[in-house]
Amino acid sequence: MPDYMFLLESRLSPEQRAVMLRVQELSAALGFNVYLTGGTVRDLVTGASLRDLDFTVEGNPSKIAHELEKGGARILSEDEKLRHVEVLFAGDCEGSISAARDDHYVRPGTRPEIRWSTIMEDLRRRDFSLNAIAISLNPASRGLLLDPTNGLSDIERAEVRALTIHSFTNQPVRLLRVLRFAARMGFKIEQRTQEWFDLAIERNLQQTITPEDAGGELRAVAREERPSVVLKAWEEHDLLEAVNPVLAKKHPAYDAIGRLMKVREDLFTAGFRPRLAAPMLLAVLGRLKDREQANVLSKAGFRSAESEAALGFEEESLEAQKELVGRKMNASVDAFRFLEKLPLDQIAYLMAESNKSAALSKIRAFLNKWRPVRNALPVVATELEALGMPRGTKFDQIVEQVFALQLTGRGKTREEREKILRKLSGIKEPPKKKEKEKKPAKGVDKAHAAAAMGDAAHKKHAAAEIEAMKHAAKGKPASPKPHAKHAAPASHGKSAASSKKSHARK
């Protein structure tokens, strides 16, 4: 048996792991048993990306949700009757917390009586076997897989199997849902389930789908990774009319959906995890007029605030584009700061639908050039600190100034950044040290002096030889000229000798 807890922890993002641990902690404090269920477990065993964290507790999930809210989570919607809470957890993770329950039908097709139950009863009352799997997060059974309907086998066979013959009768919206799961996962519908599906269509059960249930499926499609495949499957089975007759007549805007899906891939490549529900909803309804779009959302059970946000999304995005291409955004750093705060779904919408080259070039620069520079900014801070600048307000300002210069192409090398940092911080370069001349050793000094004396004697001897050769060439013996000091004594000696000879003759 695989170690599902190890698989889960190795596949979770750090933010998702923190959420899971916090929910475990709160559940234990309240005395609730807690389980990961539904899509989270299904995506885990199929190897798909874990988009949401779905928790089921044997207790009231509202208490946990409101405690999480204190730590930064946001409650998106809460159904008190079903005890189901949609949550945007801290760390920007989506998910839900539900109470374990059993739906008791007096007869097929009637409204169920809700009873709070154990996890096993909750799994057995679900729509399809691939959604009826759970992993325990409780201390005594942590990592234990619960699969009472043999959903793992159906996943291995790549089949979507309903759990009861009354599945579509009790909840006709499952006609849309079974096609959505099959299209999303590339699965086929199990044989008996297909027979029940065909029988339900023959009985026109699709016409009994409530607007609220249809709206729920419309929201789900907007969050799908392959929305076009799901919508086409609905159209092939004439089920799009159950969502809305006008949409069925005019058809979804598949070209707009395709553009948005391409943008979604680009954002994933750039390191984002975009939630594109609003722009995708507009893309699905793209062929409808504004009034028709509003009518579809109203009939689909969208709350007024939710509907206004969706219908006003395009206008808000175009206003943002107008500001982005304005004069105030000429500097790259100003455009970066603006785009950094702009909601990602608006950026995606502009990438898919804008025809303004100036806006698109700035968005591409933001995603592919400016953000990597921003992510490398801690290196600049480290370099400034190494120069001796203490951290503080001025320190942060200098780092931001360097970032602004880097967006213009300056400060690419470490040497260039150091010059910029010194100039901005006022830290001067240390004075260069002069190299002292090395004194030779005493023995070496004497050797040099002796060599110098030898050279002088050699030169003097060579000069004398040259002088002798010159005199020999003239026929005169070469005689060294006496020094002036010695001339007088020689002359005096000659006079004395002459005087002696003179006396002798006399």
Features from the language model and the residues they span:
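Catalytic cores of the polymerase beta-like nucleotidyltransferase superfamily
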Residues: 1-506
